[in-house]
Amino acid sequence: MIFHANPGVIDLGVNIDHVATLRNARGTVYPDPIRAALLAEQAGADLITLHLREDRRHIRDADVRALRPQLATRMNLECALTQEMLDIACEIRPQDVCLVPERREEVTTEGGLDVAGRFEQVKAACAQLAGAGIRVSLFIDADADQIAAAAACGAPVIELHTGRYADAHTPDEQALEFRRIADGVDAGQKHGLVVNAGHGLHYTNVQPIAALPGIKELNIGHAIVAHAVFAGWENAVREMKAIMVAARLGTRYPAAGAPA
């Protein structure tokens, strides 16, 4: 099944980290995350997201440098709040940098950045990145204090952490987490922020989040890489974008893998 989606309704950022994870598992040069990014653009991705972690467990410095001049859309570079990463970002100058919390022992990002608790450090980082012409996003929980702190430190964009929504064990728990995200979207907009969201979203839980009209962009990676094993990379990207757009427009698309 080939999917086509209208552009401009809601943006899809395709995260290519786990293409690099697959490459690094065998120490080979394939699969190439650069090729994955360019094919994702052709399939309808509105931007490419990649996380340069301090331990370089998937994306490497060379990947970021090689990809930056080749993208036709936007690069959204995720990185920790360290001077090393800020300096790398200011050297490469992606269109967007999303500051995220990072712990070496975690499998994946486990929560939002504590902007309120690290206010001066975050504010200084926002100023450094903005001075290099980079738009700053802060990956935070859907918490009123964190959203207010993000606005106060000068970040124009927030990305709301959807991991607790994605990991909810019961419908009631998921409904509660969804309400928190929806309230966070409203709070972000009241502060004049662009509101994005991401983490843990996949083909059967993305619809309610994508339907929220205040969300500009969703960043999704692992689910697309996993689905591509069966559906093919470009069609996996097309399918995710089509599901998101259908949710925003109030229409329906077949579930992943369902017949047309």
Swiss-Prot record:
GO terms for cellular component: cytosol. GO terms for biological process: pyridoxine biosynthetic process. GO terms for molecular function: pyridoxine 5'-phosphate synthase activity. Keywords: Cytoplasm, Pyridoxine biosynthesis, Transferase. 3-amino-2-oxopropyl phosphate binds at residues 15, 26, 200, 221-222. It is an enzyme of class 2 (transferase). Belongs to the PNP synthase family. This is Pyridoxine 5'-phosphate synthase. The gene is pdxJ.
